Protein backbone atom coordinates (compact mmCIF):
# COMPACT_ATOMS: atom_id res chain seq x y z
CA UNK A 1 0.00 0.00 0.00
CA UNK A 2 1.57 3.31 -1.05
CA UNK A 3 2.06 5.96 1.59
CA UNK A 4 1.24 9.63 1.17
CA UNK A 5 4.95 10.28 0.66
CA UNK A 6 5.04 7.64 -2.10
CA UNK A 7 2.09 9.32 -3.83
CA UNK A 8 3.67 12.77 -3.52
CA UNK A 9 6.91 11.52 -5.06
CA UNK A 10 5.00 9.80 -7.88
CA UNK A 11 3.23 12.99 -8.99
CA UNK A 12 5.93 15.54 -8.15
CA UNK A 13 6.55 17.86 -11.08
CA UNK A 14 3.50 16.52 -12.94
CA UNK A 15 0.46 17.62 -10.96
CA UNK A 16 -0.81 19.53 -8.01
CA UNK A 17 -2.90 17.79 -5.40
CA UNK A 18 -6.16 18.16 -3.60
CA UNK A 19 -5.22 16.42 -0.36
CA UNK A 20 -8.34 15.43 1.55
CA UNK A 21 -7.96 14.97 5.29
CA UNK A 22 -10.52 12.29 6.14
CA UNK A 23 -9.44 11.41 9.66
CA UNK A 24 -9.37 13.68 12.68
CA UNK A 25 -5.86 14.43 13.90
CA UNK A 26 -4.04 13.90 10.58
CA UNK A 27 -3.35 17.54 9.67
CA UNK A 28 0.14 17.75 11.13
CA UNK A 29 1.23 14.42 9.62
CA UNK A 30 -0.08 15.39 6.19
CA UNK A 31 1.66 18.77 6.21
CA UNK A 32 4.90 17.20 7.43
CA UNK A 33 4.77 14.57 4.67
CA UNK A 34 4.39 17.31 2.03
CA UNK A 35 7.30 19.21 3.58
CA UNK A 36 9.53 16.12 3.95
CA UNK A 37 9.40 15.30 0.26
CA UNK A 38 9.79 18.99 -0.62
CA UNK A 39 6.69 18.82 -2.81
CA UNK A 40 6.68 22.09 -4.74
CA UNK A 41 3.55 21.68 -6.85
CA UNK A 42 0.32 23.21 -5.56
CA UNK A 43 -1.38 21.43 -2.66
CA UNK A 44 -4.86 22.31 -1.47
CA UNK A 45 -5.74 20.74 1.86
CA UNK A 46 -9.43 19.82 1.94
CA UNK A 47 -11.69 18.39 4.59
CA UNK A 48 -15.25 17.94 5.77
CA UNK A 49 -13.66 18.10 9.25
CA UNK A 50 -13.24 21.85 9.33
CA UNK A 51 -11.22 21.85 12.56
CA UNK A 52 -8.58 19.91 10.61
CA UNK A 53 -8.24 22.91 8.30
CA UNK A 54 -7.56 25.12 11.31
CA UNK A 55 -4.84 22.66 12.33
CA UNK A 56 -3.28 22.73 8.86
CA UNK A 57 -3.07 26.50 9.17
CA UNK A 58 -0.94 26.01 12.33
CA UNK A 59 1.66 23.97 10.43
CA UNK A 60 1.38 25.55 6.97
CA UNK A 61 0.24 29.16 7.46
CA UNK A 62 -0.02 29.98 3.75
CA UNK A 63 -1.51 26.72 2.50
CA UNK A 64 -4.74 26.89 0.49
CA UNK A 65 -7.59 25.25 2.41
CA UNK A 66 -10.85 23.87 1.06
CA UNK A 67 -13.85 23.52 3.35
CA UNK A 68 -15.89 20.64 1.99
CA UNK A 69 -19.64 20.55 2.55
CA UNK A 70 -21.97 17.60 2.11
CA UNK A 71 -25.16 18.90 3.64
CA UNK A 72 -25.09 22.65 3.64
CA UNK A 73 -25.07 24.40 7.01
CA UNK A 74 -27.10 27.56 7.52
CA UNK A 75 -24.25 29.76 6.26
CA UNK A 76 -21.46 27.82 4.55
CA UNK A 77 -19.63 31.03 3.60
CA UNK A 78 -19.26 32.08 7.23
CA UNK A 79 -18.24 28.55 8.20
CA UNK A 80 -15.54 28.43 5.51
CA UNK A 81 -14.15 31.87 6.34
CA UNK A 82 -14.16 31.09 10.08
CA UNK A 83 -11.91 28.10 9.45
CA UNK A 84 -9.53 30.07 7.24
CA UNK A 85 -10.56 28.43 3.97
CA UNK A 86 -9.60 29.90 0.63
CA UNK A 87 -11.78 27.41 -1.25
CA UNK A 88 -15.19 25.81 -0.79
CA UNK A 89 -16.10 22.37 -2.08
CA UNK A 90 -19.80 21.85 -2.72
CA UNK A 91 -21.61 18.71 -3.80
CA UNK A 92 -22.50 19.18 -7.45
CA UNK A 93 -26.17 18.61 -6.65
CA UNK A 94 -26.32 21.19 -3.84
CA UNK A 95 -24.42 24.03 -5.51
CA UNK A 96 -26.51 26.95 -6.73
CA UNK A 97 -25.67 30.07 -8.68
CA UNK A 98 -26.63 32.18 -5.66
CA UNK A 99 -24.32 30.23 -3.32
CA UNK A 100 -21.42 30.34 -5.79
CA UNK A 101 -21.85 34.11 -6.07
CA UNK A 102 -21.94 34.49 -2.27
CA UNK A 103 -18.71 32.52 -1.97
CA UNK A 104 -17.06 34.62 -4.66
CA UNK A 105 -18.14 37.85 -2.93
CA UNK A 106 -16.37 36.56 0.20
CA UNK A 107 -13.20 35.92 -1.81
CA UNK A 108 -13.60 32.15 -1.84
CA UNK A 109 -12.88 29.93 -4.83
CA UNK A 110 -15.57 27.32 -5.44
CA UNK A 111 -15.31 23.75 -6.67
CA UNK A 112 -18.06 21.19 -7.13
CA UNK A 113 -17.53 17.51 -6.41
CA UNK A 114 -17.82 14.66 -7.47
CA UNK A 115 -19.05 15.47 -10.95
CA UNK A 116 -18.44 12.30 -12.91
CA UNK A 117 -20.95 12.53 -15.73
CA UNK A 118 -21.01 15.19 -18.45
CA UNK A 119 -24.36 16.60 -17.30
CA UNK A 120 -23.06 17.23 -13.75
CA UNK A 121 -19.82 18.71 -15.08
CA UNK A 122 -21.72 21.09 -17.37
CA UNK A 123 -24.07 22.05 -14.54
CA UNK A 124 -21.14 22.95 -12.30
CA UNK A 125 -19.49 24.98 -15.03
CA UNK A 126 -22.75 26.79 -15.77
CA UNK A 127 -22.83 27.99 -12.15
CA UNK A 128 -19.51 29.78 -12.60
CA UNK A 129 -17.46 27.54 -10.33
CA UNK A 130 -13.69 27.77 -10.32
CA UNK A 131 -13.11 24.04 -10.47
CA UNK A 132 -14.73 20.66 -10.92
CA UNK A 133 -13.60 17.64 -8.93
CA UNK A 134 -14.13 14.35 -10.74
CA UNK A 135 -12.89 10.79 -10.81
CA UNK A 136 -12.65 11.25 -14.59
CA UNK A 137 -10.57 14.36 -15.38
CA UNK A 138 -10.63 13.58 -19.09
CA UNK A 139 -14.40 14.19 -19.04
CA UNK A 140 -13.78 17.68 -17.69
CA UNK A 141 -11.32 18.36 -20.51
CA UNK A 142 -13.92 17.19 -23.03
CA UNK A 143 -16.64 19.34 -21.43
CA UNK A 144 -14.51 22.48 -21.56
CA UNK A 145 -13.46 22.19 -25.21
Predicted stretch roles:
Residues 1, 66-145:
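C-terminal active-site rim and adjoining tail of enzyme catalytic domains
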Amino acid sequence: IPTLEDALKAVAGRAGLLLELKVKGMAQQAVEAVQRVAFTDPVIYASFLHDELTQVRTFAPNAPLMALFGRLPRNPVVRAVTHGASHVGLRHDTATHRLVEACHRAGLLVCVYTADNPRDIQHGLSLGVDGVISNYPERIRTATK
